[in-house]
């Protein structure tokens, strides 16, 4: 799926995807609002305990849902600190070539990503 930008678009796309004859047993969403739409669709279809879900980036209340939403959490403080360091180096006259800095992520297991596939 592509060109989905909000929770309602995600909800509709996930509903369509899960209505197929051979629906997926797991979903990975790449943005918070898409994850929220996926949660809505799974709950409405009563599949929240049958289809695994892992989202990229944490969001408020992810742990309060049932099951809690498993996410790949970013570290925004480390990202900001790294960006600021590179910016201030450049402002200070650094002529180093562009570089890639990797900021580690963390898998936060809350239950939704650990749902085992089931046969229909």
Where are these regions (language model features)?
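Hinge/beta->alpha junction and helix N-cap segments in small-molecule ligand-binding domains
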Residues: 1-13, 26-36, 56-60, 73-82, ...
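Alpha-helical structural signal in soluble globular domains
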Residues: 11, 16, 37-45
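Surface-exposed charged/polar residues within alpha-helices that form helix-capping/stabilizing sites
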Residues: 16-19, 89
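Short helix-capping segments at alpha-helix termini
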Residues: 20-22, 43-49
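Hinge/cleft segment of the Venus flytrap/periplasmic-binding protein
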Residues: 49, 76-120
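Glycine-rich, charge-decorated loop segments at or immediately adjacent to ligand/cofactor-binding or catalytic sites
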Residues: 62-67
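A short acidic/histidine/glycine-rich donor-binding loop in glycosyltransferase catalytic cores
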Residues: 69-71
């Amino acid at each position: 799926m592509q060109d989905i930008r909000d929770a309602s678009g995600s909800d509709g796309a996930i509903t369509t995807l899960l209505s197929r004859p051979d629906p997926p047993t797991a979903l990975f969403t790449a943005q918070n609002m898409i994850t929220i739409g996926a949660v809505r669709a799974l709950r409405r279809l009563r599949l929240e305990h049958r289809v695994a879900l892992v989202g990229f980036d944490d969001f408020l209340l992810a742990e309060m849902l049932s099951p809690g939403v498993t996410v790949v959490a970013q570290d925004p403080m480390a990202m900001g600190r790294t960006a600021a360091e590179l910016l201030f180096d450049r402002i200070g006259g650094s002529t180093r070539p562009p570089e890639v800095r990797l900021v580690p992520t963390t898998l936060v297991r809350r239950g939704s990503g650990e749902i085992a596939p089931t046969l229909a």
